[in-house]
Amino acid sequence: LVLKNVYIVTTNCVGLVTGGSVSELWSRHRELADAVAREVISIQAALTGRTFDADALIEGMLKAFDGDPDHKCMGRSAPARLARAIQQADEAGLDIPRLRGIAAAQQTT
């Protein structure tokens, strides 16, 4: 379930900025996608009270990308998922600068 959340929240939130497919996300916006995935993993760790191997989860996310490379990053639930991730991070006292940057960019457009 954690891997599924990493995939969905990362692709939806980064997709708010980049649009496109998951294969384009990784090929054109890897640094942002990796940073956001790591923030999402920290949120998942706080929610579950467990620690996770971020590199292994990101590898799992990439395997999912390979399974459906043309899958679109952003659906209509993306803004709500971003808001929920920020709320969860706030409740856990986590530093999530990339997710906050995406939210700030959404407010100015």
Describe every region a protein language model picked out.
Residues 34-109:
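NAD(P)-dependent Rossmann-like dehydrogenase/reductase catalytic/cofactor-binding core
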